[in-house]
Amino acid sequence: MITVSAPAKVNLHLEVLGLRSDGFHELAMVMQSIDLADRLSFQNTADAQLSLTCDDASLSVGDDNLILRAAQLLRDRSGFSELGASIHLEKRIPIGAGLAGGSSDGAAALVGLNALWGLGHSTADLERMAAELGSDMPFCVAGGCQLCFGRGEQLEAVPPTPQPLAVLLVKDPTVSVSTPWAYKRCRELKQSHYLADEAAFEQRRQALRSVDWLQPLRSDLPPPLRNDLQDVVAPETAAVRSALDLLDSVPQSLAVAMSGSGPSCFGLFSDLASCRHAQDQLATQLERAGLKAWSCALRSDGVRIEA
């Protein structure tokens, strides 16, 4: 049996640059892995079947699940149709939260089954396969802190910070946001401000490359968090506004933002102890607002084989 850890991510920067010729949005992002993680276990089977179980009954375990789609793609590319596996998912990352939980689980399937079946694919091979399944999935394979361009699949690693930064995640467990809706709404509201060509896109990429990410504490300025979808989602989602307001009320928070298309929001803290203290401070208000919270350290890797 092989066990794989599949971490969540937050977006430290999500900039919608414009529209691509294929209809997708051109993005410039900084994504960061955190230690809130799902756990997947993989065992060989002799019947050439791919099966998935999960400890969260609300999650679909049918063929539409990214875990099984990733497993099928990897097996197809291997040429060994007789390969089979039983997969069990312990779900810890909230579903539909803007934290790439599904993408990370799919990436974990590629990494875990590559090892279980002894296929020998490189990380680069797995990232290319991941890109066929989802825009966030290559990042989930690589993890750590990455600049992410294109649809999010083009990665450039950012050196890890020497500082023990942490994030306090906050989410209403009853609320989810449709990612396609968020980008459609962004287009409706902001298309007049979109950049028009590759030269303009590259200028913004270069500007992002010049930012010294995750090392803002040398000055009194807050970290340069940005999420263009926050301006779209927050006005129409009370749970996002409540989460941002609560996080912003904590004096120790360095900056706050929504992650991905939401509705999860996070505050950035100088260390895990400060983060946990803030969670304790907010406990009554969080409960009153129906919000759940997680104190998380940053991770320097993506999906990882644990055993």
From Swiss-Prot:
**Source organism superkingdom:** Bacteria
Per its UniProt entry, what is the enzyme's top EC class, as one word? transferase
The protein's UniProt keywords, in alphabetical order, are: ATP-binding, Isoprene biosynthesis, Kinase, Nucleotide-binding, Transferase
KW Ion transport (keyword) present: no
Q: Which InterPro entries match?
A: GHMP_kinase_C_dom, GHMP_kinase_C_sf, GHMP_kinase_N_dom, IspE, Ribosomal_Su5_D2-typ_SF, Ribsml_uS5_D2-typ_fold_subgr
Question: Pathway, per Swiss-Prot/TrEMBL?
Answer: Isoprenoid biosynthesis; isopentenyl diphosphate biosynthesis via DXP pathway; isopentenyl diphosphate from 1-deoxy-D-xylulose 5-phosphate: step 3/6
- Give the binding site residues for ATP: 94-104
Any Pfam family: GHMP_kinases_C
Q: Which GO terms describe its biological process?
A: isopentenyl diphosphate biosynthetic process, methylerythritol 4-phosphate pathway; terpenoid biosynthetic process
Under Enzyme Commission nomenclature, its number is 2.7.1.148
- Catalytic residues in the record: 9, 136
Q: For this protein, what reaction is catalysed?
A: 4-CDP-2-C-methyl-D-erythritol + ATP = 4-CDP-2-C-methyl-D-erythritol 2-phosphate + ADP + H(+)
Q: Which PANTHER family match?
A: 4-DIPHOSPHOCYTIDYL-2-C-METHYL-D-ERYTHRITOL KINASE, CHLOROPLASTIC
Q: Which family does it belong to?
A: Belongs to the GHMP kinase family. IspE subfamily.
Name of the protein in its database record: 4-diphosphocytidyl-2-C-methyl-D-erythritol kinase
Organism encoding this protein? Synechococcus sp. (strain CC9605)
What does the organism's lineage look like at the top? Bacteria, Bacillati, Cyanobacteriota, Cyanophyceae, Synechococcales
